[in-house]
Structure formats: structure tokens, C-alpha cells
From Swiss-Prot:
S-adenosyl-L-methionine binds at G89, E112, I113, N148, A149, C168, T246, E247, E248. SUPFAM superfamilies: S-adenosyl-L-methionine-dependent methyltransferases. Residues 1-20 have a biased composition (Basic and acidic residues). Pathway: tRNA modification; N(7)-methylguanine-tRNA biosynthesis. PROSITE patterns: SAM_MT_TRMB. It comes from the Eukaryota. InterPro entries: SAM-dependent_MTases_sf (IPR029063), Trm8_euk (IPR025763), tRNA_(Gua-N-7)_MeTrfase_Trmb (IPR003358). Forms a complex with TRM82. GO terms for molecular function: tRNA (guanine(46)-N7)-methyltransferase activity; tRNA binding. Catalyzes the formation of N(7)-methylguanine at position 46 (m7G46) in tRNA. NCBIfam families: tRNA (guanosine(46)-N7)-methyltransferase TrmB. This is tRNA (guanine-N(7)-)-methyltransferase. The gene is TRM8.
Amino acid sequence: MSTDSESKRRAYREEKEGARKKSVKLAPEATPESKPDLPRKRYYRQRAHSNPFSDHSLDYPRNPDAMEWGKLYPEYANTDKKVEIADIGCGYGGLMIGLAKEYPQTMILGMEIRVQVTQYVEDRIIALREKHEKDEVNYQNIAVLRGNAMKFLPNFFHRGQLKKMFFCFPDPHFKQRKHKARIITTTLLSEYAYVLREEGVLYTITDVEDLHIWMVKHLDDHPLFERLDKEWEKNDKCVSIMYGSTEEGQKVARNKGSKFVACFRRVANPEE
């Protein structure tokens, strides 16, 4: 990122932080015109993908019980509610925002490894929460954290905690020697099966047919996942949201590209 872009982004964040503090002090007299604007992507530029095997400086809990969710979901800080929907590699947060309207009482988490993109989503959520503070859908149930799901997913979630997991337009890693870095592999699927409850659903969507075939094959071959048919996909509201709400999906649509969807149910563990 250029120094000029970085300084503009920093100035933008400082301006919005000042506006947020001012709005808190003047809350009783706040007007619709004083509501914060959504952040602008051009101040948060970053590469399209990040190497998951790099030694990123990441914070993660020792175990799920050590995770302080109240910092991300202040409205639920004194409740027993837990995250039940995870968007792995959430990008700019479009899917979470779409899901928040459909599941306003369900805690939804986006995990994103890229620094600038995570900061953008953080600011976007803050702005949405303040803009819709008194609305039925107030976006208090969505949050984002910077994390590497390929390494630390079990540090965040208990066994069987999640009911839905989304993998939207993941890095295709075209070169064969890079396939080990794909987000869907046999080893990783076992971890996803661990945090996904029985009858939970794993959703995938991509515009790369070769990657779609790869993901379907690995999920088909895994004993704890069973593919849901096209009729189920047609009637599932989350598929519709996933198909049209992500920024990458909208880009594919503008370019008249294809989208390949596959959804799998988490089946019961085999009897020992």
C-alpha cells in the first residue's frame, strides 16, 4: 500500500472514530444526518489473497473457553450465546451482512487473514451498528476477527458449536504444488466436521470450476459429509444470500461469469 493511501486510510479512521465518540456524547440529540458513513474500500487496499502458511502475527485463544466474545459482541457479553455461523475467509463482509438480516438473533463470525480487509470489515460493522442502532436488525450479532482458520479453528470453537460454515470464493491456488494450501482438504475437513454439529451445513461457492470439482470430490470422499441435492439448494435461503451478497460474487456477476455451488450436511459420527 502506498504511503499516500495509508495516510488517507488512517485519517479516515481517525475522523470516523472522532465522529463515533461525539455521537456517543450527543446520543440523546442525535439526528439521522449525524449517523456515520460506511467506510470506503479504496483506503483498505490489499492483495486478493494471503499465504496461509506464512508466519502471520495473529492473536488466538488457548482454547474456546479462553475466547472473550464479549469484546466482539458487546450486546451479548452477559449471555450464554455462542457463535453458530462462521464465514471462513469473509472478505469484505457482504455475506455476514446478508445473513444478519435473516438471522438477527444468531451470532455470526467472519474470519479473515488479511489485515486491511479485516480493518475494513471492523469499521463497516461499527458504522452499521451505529446507523441502525434502533432498528430491529442492528448488526450487533455480526463480528470479524483476523485469524487463520487453517491453523487455529479449534482454538475458537467447541466441538459441534457451529450450525453453518461458509467458504465463498476461496483462493483457487491453481498450481498443483499449491493445492495443499486450498481451504478444502481431507485434513481440514476433519477439523470442520469437529466444530460443525450433526445436521449442520457446509456451504461452498466458487467461480472456478476446477476448484469446485476439487472441493466436491474431497467432501464426497469424507465420511462425515453428505451432499445435499439441487432441490435443497434451490429452497435454502442461505444459498440465495450466498449467491448474491458477497462482493466477489457480485464481481463475477458483473463479468457474466459462472458460479458453482455445493452444500454438504454434517452426518453423524460412525458408531464405534
